[in-house]
């Protein structure tokens, strides 16, 4: 029976601290994460204001570094972006996580008799869906470690894959998907005991603590 989760990272270029519930302003998300999520919209030349307004987020907030949005607004934004680009992973992997993938992931794990088996199935599923990011589950008693692997940083990969550094937001999104899924399965907020990453902290690092 797993009671907590630790996070570590291998073969990557970013350092990330996992999101913890904030003592202040619970249920809110930094505008920095909104800007990160919107990067795929800008890169594709789509209408950012239209996507933001679907989530009830004023476009001017992107120019206010201390602004925050509600967790619900960020969830609606995630859905709107996924619908706009047909990718539930914000276009951050070479292979898109097409709309409907997360629903199928939930169906794939819902009948698991233990959380450990559910996480193993989830990691196998994500390995099939994504090309560059994958995870490994290491259990030590009641503590589970999720080890993140990023193929973009492998030395034997084509140079084109490593030409652009991986955004820490990609690593965080991968872990948030897994952690949110695990909490949903057991109906509890599973505590994150710690995180270890191999490079400097990204912008808005305090927001992940």
What feature does the model see in each segment?
Residues 115-209:
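Alpha-helical bundle regulatory/interaction domains
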Residues 3, 7-151, 203-204:
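N-terminal low-complexity or simple alpha-helical regulatory segments
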């Amino acid at each position: 029976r797993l009671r907590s989760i630790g996070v570590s990272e291998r073969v990557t270029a970013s350092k990330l601290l996992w999101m913890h519930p904030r003592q202040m302003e619970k249920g809110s998300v930094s505008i920095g994460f909104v800007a990160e999520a919107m990067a795929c919209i800008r890169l594709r030349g789509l209408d950012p204001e239209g996507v933001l307004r679907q989530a009830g987020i004023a476009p001017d907030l992107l120019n206010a570094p201390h602004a925050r949005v509600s967790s619900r607004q960020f969830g609606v934004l995630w859905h709107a972006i996924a619908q706009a680009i047909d990718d539930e992973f914000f276009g951050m992997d070479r292979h898109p996580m097409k709309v409907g993938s997360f629903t199928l992931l939930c169906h794939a794990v819902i009948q698991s008799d233990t959380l450990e088996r559910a996480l193993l199935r989830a990691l196998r599923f994500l390995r099939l869906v994504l090309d560059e990011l994958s995870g490994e589950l290491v259990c030590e008693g009641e503590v589970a470690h999720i080890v993140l692997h990023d193929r973009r940083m492998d030395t034997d990969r084509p140079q084109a894959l490593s030409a652009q550094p991986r955004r820490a937001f990609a690593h965080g999104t991968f872990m948030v998907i897994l952690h949110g899924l695990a909490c949903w399965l057991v109906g509890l907020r599973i505590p994150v005991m710690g995180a270890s990453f191999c490079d400097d902290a990204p912008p808005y690092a305090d927001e992940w603590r």
